[in-house]
Amino acid sequence: MEQFAHISVQETQQKLAAKEARLVDIRDEQSFVAGHIEGAVHLTNGTLVNFTQETDFDTPVIVCCYHGVSSQQAAQFLLHQGFEEVYSMDGGFEAWRQSLPFVSGE
């Protein structure tokens, strides 16, 4: 895979339920703490090294941001780091939270 792929919220939910992918959330810490998808890893510049060391490069990775825009750049970056199958979740966390459950920090 030389280019990341787009994935819908529904397809993301299916892959996560089947434990077929890891989900990373690149939103700021305050937003992540306030609410995130269960099982998501908060990926920041500070956690990137640990994530790449703990995750097999052949594990599919789905990138989530606010609206599905920033995740595209992050997905491409992860491909360049050596991950073989990377997705950008269309609509981001805002699309997910409209119809699917999430972990709330409140």
From Swiss-Prot:
CDD domains for the chain: GlpE_ST
Keyword tags: Cytoplasm, Transferase
SMART domains, alphabetized: RHOD
Superkingdom of origin organism: Bacteria
Main location: cytoplasm
Keyword Transferase applies: yes
Function of the protein: Transferase that catalyzes the transfer of sulfur from thiosulfate to thiophilic acceptors such as cyanide or dithiols. May function in a CysM-independent thiosulfate assimilation pathway by catalyzing the conversion of thiosulfate to sulfite, which can then be used for L-cysteine biosynthesis.
PANTHER family: FAD-DEPENDENT OXIDOREDUCTASE, THIOSULFATE SULFURTRANSFERASE GLPE
Family stated for the protein in its record: Belongs to the GlpE family.
Name of the protein in question: Thiosulfate sulfurtransferase GlpE
Organism expressing this protein natively: Pseudoalteromonas atlantica (strain T6c / ATCC BAA-1087)
